[in-house]
């Protein structure tokens, strides 16, 4: 059975020409056809940017609320006090606290995907940098997770906000949905992310900014996107 599945996957993967770029709509269709794993694969994008990643003023970091969500169930923890505690809970936060939440995190209990904090609680959150930082959970105003509007931040996280940043090679990796999404939904999610990354272009960046766009499913082949079909 396994050999049969492998052969089928190979046949599907052969549909993808490695040296060809595809219009976005065609790339998404191919990815869905090639994704034959027994689980609902994620669909990921890799965006190679024409920046000097060694320079801090060209590093890109941000967040996009995908119009159709990411397909993930997101658990949100919020550092808040006063009225913001109830606001966070009403917006759907899973965990809300301050010193008690900090103690929980220091004890290794990190059962959440996003951490949001109000500015005045950063005196507590700042001490957790060595724990939250390596996990990509440290609140940051650049991605809207340090904010006075905790209700909106929680709702955004729950509705499918994705965070992104350039790696050391100037590449952004991000998930835009799941294989079971409608093709149109994946296309709109991709374009929402791409538009935000375009807006974030550093003034110091020279030459072609969006150098290469690649889509893939968790277990599938990478498919290069024709940049002219997405206004890149």
UniProtKB/Swiss-Prot annotation:
Matches recorded under InterPro entries: Ribosom_uL1_bac-type, Ribosomal_uL1, Ribosomal_uL1-like, Ribosomal_uL1/biogenesis, Ribosomal_uL1_3-a/b-sand, Ribosomal_uL1_CS
Keywords: Repressor, Ribonucleoprotein, Ribosomal protein, RNA-binding, rRNA-binding, Translation regulation, tRNA-binding
Biological process according to GO: regulation of translation; translation
GO molecular function: rRNA binding; structural constituent of ribosome; tRNA binding
Cellular component GO terms, alphabetical: cytosolic large ribosomal subunit
Transmembrane segments: none
Function: Binds directly to 23S rRNA. The L1 stalk is quite mobile in the ribosome, and is involved in E site tRNA release. Protein L1 is also a translational repressor protein, it controls the translation of the L11 operon by binding to its mRNA.
HAMAP family: Ribosomal_uL1_B
Entry's family note: Belongs to the universal ribosomal protein uL1 family.
NCBIfam families: rplA_bact (TIGR01169)
Subunit structure: Part of the 50S ribosomal subunit.
Protein name (record): Large ribosomal subunit protein uL1
């Amino acid at each position: 059975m396994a050999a049969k599945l492998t052969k089928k996957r190979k046949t599907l993967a052969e549909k993808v020409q490695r040296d060809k770029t595809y219009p976005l709509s065609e790339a998404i269709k191919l990815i869905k056809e090639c994704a034959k794993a027994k689980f609902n694969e994620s669909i990921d994008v890799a965006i190679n940017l024409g920046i000097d990643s060694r320079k801090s003023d060209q590093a890109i970091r941000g967040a996009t609320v995908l119009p159709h969500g990411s397909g993930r169930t997101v658990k949100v923890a919020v550092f808040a006090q006063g009225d913001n505690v109830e606001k966070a809970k009403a917006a759907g936060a899973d965990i809300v606290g301050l010193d008690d939440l900090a103690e929980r995190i220091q004890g290794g209990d990190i059962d959440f995907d996003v951490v949001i904090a109000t500015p005045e609680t950063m005196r507590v959150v700042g001490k957790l940098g060595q724990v939250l930082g390596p996990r990509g959970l440290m609140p940051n105003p650049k991605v809207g997770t340090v904010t006075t509007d905790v209700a909106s931040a929680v709702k955004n996280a729950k509705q499918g906000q994705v965070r992104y940043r350039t790696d050391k090679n100037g590449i952004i990796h991000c998930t835009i949905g799941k294989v079971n999404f409608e093709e149109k939904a994946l296309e709109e999610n991709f374009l929402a992310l791409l538009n935000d990354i375009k807006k974030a272009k550093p003034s110091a960046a020279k030459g072609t900014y969006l150098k290469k766009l690649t889509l893939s499913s968790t277990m599938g082949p990478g498919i290069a996107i024709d940049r002219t079909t997405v206004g890149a």
